[in-house]
Regions:
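Nucleotide-activated sugar donor-binding and catalytic core shared by glycosyltransferases
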Residues: 1-145
């Protein structure tokens, strides 16, 4: 089971992680909350400051980062983003996303970004940029419809 394997790997590198489907009460020392159900992720973007889009770990095209960006989340992603290369390129220009190359470098990146995001002004800036980016993309899409 891949989700339990990921959970074990994160716990092994010192990141206290929890699966959404475990239905356990979330504790303050949880570093990573894994939403492992289809269609529920969007319900959590407004509650978080940092999102890792796990669909980018497998070669199926990636996940759209715009919903997460619009809620002011800093976005971490894996190597497989073929369907959203241009979107990620744009987000990288705004410095609101980081590529995770391996599970081993995830711990340091997550800790670094959590410390960075403790500052409330950063989250407000990310939310503002996310709104701008999403609105710009919606405008571009409407031109073709």
């Amino acid at each position: 089971n891949r989700k339990n394997e990921i959970l074990d790997e994160l716990n092994n590198i010192g990141l206290n992680s929890q699966l959404h489907t475990s239905r356990k009460k979330l504790s303050k020392d949880t570093d990573i909350y894994i939403v492992d159900t289809y269609g529920d992720t969007k319900n959590f973007y407004s509650l978080s400051k940092l999102t890792f889009l796990g669909g980018s770990l497998i070669p199926h095209g990636g996940q759209n980062p715009l919903e997460s960006a619009r809620e002011g989340n800093y976005i971490l992603y894996g190597p497989h983003i073929d369907n959203f290369k241009e979107v990620y390129k744009m987000l990288e220009k705004f410095k609101i996303t980081t590529k995770i190359n391996s599970i081993k470098n995830m711990k340091s990146v997550v800790r670094q970004k959590i410390n960075f995001l403790q500052r409330n002004t950063v989250n407000k800036k990310l939310k503002y940029l996310g709104d701008k980016i999403l609105n710009k993309n919606l405008y571009e899409i409407k031109k073709f419809i």
